[in-house]
Amino acid sequence: PLLVLDLIIQERGESFSHTVTAQHTSAKVEGLKAGTVYSVQVRARTVAGYGRYSNPVDFSTSLYVCPVSSSSTSMHLRRREELTTTTTGLKSREERFQKSDDPERSVQDLLPLIVGSASAGFVVILAMIVIAVVCLRRQRTGSELEYTEKLQQYVSPGVKVYIDPFTYEDPNEAVHEFAREIDISCVKIEEVIGAGEFGEVCRGRLKQAGRKETTVAIKTLKAGYTEHQRRDFLSEASIMGQFDHPNVIHLEGVLTRSCPVLIVTEFMENGALDSFLRLNDGRFTVTQLVGMLRGIAAGMKYLSDMNYVHRDLAARNVLVNSNLVCKVSDFGLSRFLDDNSSDPTYTSSLGGKIPIRWTAPEAIAFRKFTSASDVWSYGIVMWEVMSFGERPYWDMSNQDVMNAVEQDYRLPPPMDCPAVLHQLMLECWVKERNMRPRFGQIVSTLDKFLRNAASLKVLTSTHSGDLCRIGGTLPGHQRKSIGDAQDIKQQMSQTLPIRV
């Protein structure tokens, strides 16, 4: 949308120019000199900034003018630099000139009027410039600040960028900017359905004026919290509130003025993806599983395009609704885990806790988290989905997992896994992060698989003998990497991940 229209009007042969500013797609300039050639250029300003000035367009005013009080020479500018010059009272002046017996005498009679009109026009232009400057200065404290705030969220028109709430001097400012405050009377907690790092997770109802009552998930901040914990808890809402995508969990709002402090999100009927898959082991077709993976990849592409790095992408942090739509959730929580946290999923590394089995080697070694490290984690999520919630690397210790990955061992394909999917996993696990596919490429690849169902029918053929010939004596076992169920017990103690 147009915000400001700038015009530069310059008399031919003069270095001095006049600038006029308008808030609409048209502008009217009065008080121009009679019988003078002018050049005009136009540019528009939107939220994205100033555009370029148009090419100069010349026009000339009539030799005869009327008194400023009754009529004036005008110029109107409209879209695409349409220029229309109108002069009122010109016809009557011409008729009077024709009726005069002495043309030279008529010109002399009109000379004072011409000079007076030109002088008055110049005064009007100066007055308009002064008024425009004063108005612009007054608006800058308000409208210019608004433009600046909008532009902070755009690197180019239409491309929104994630803003880290911890860049705010007052974190509460970020919460109020990105999350909507909900009145306590609109929320009803029904039952506890789980526990999070900061408190309980409940199912409840949200009823707001003019909106249908809906089932929601409610995260609570446990009693006795510190101000630091409150800030970290609400930061997830500040992050979530910036996102709007069908494969990213939706924030309904927050309750910061109540006790306990609450975060309200949409409710996902089937809960976390890993436990949902374990409860439905073998019940979904490959096409359905690939559809789930496609949804997760689409959500991650959206987050990556916004320059957001998740850091903790795993099946446990993906939620599933009643239509099997998968949505990425749990934003930023991994960075806040304390070293005394009892969760074995996260291991201390360089002053913080990270999920070793899902984390790229450069992020483990140097805490270098990027969209490429999220792609590595996505490859592990693919393995979790295709194995129906199997634990990555089985019962290997985190240290053994790090050693295996460092020695270029990778997870073998789950049972009945299409070869193209395991190949995509291996591409996500390339050691050189710049060589891994981007989420946009992953979405396109999965779309291609879904369009060509035949490509998903070619399964990988993995045998225990092949794995043993790779070498090594790393501990661990597996349940689904080998198709022969009768040999599983023997192979659990001797099979290894694939080396690349």
Curated annotation (Swiss-Prot):
Reactions it catalyzes: L-tyrosyl-[protein] + ATP = O-phospho-L-tyrosyl-[protein] + ADP + H(+)
Entry keyword annotation includes Kinase: yes
Residue numbers carrying Phosphotyrosine: 168
Residues annotated as domain SAM: 421-500
Domain of life where this protein originates: Eukaryota
Cytoplasmic side: 135-500
Name recorded for this polypeptide: Ephrin type-B receptor 3
Source species of the chain: Danio rerio
Gene: ephb3
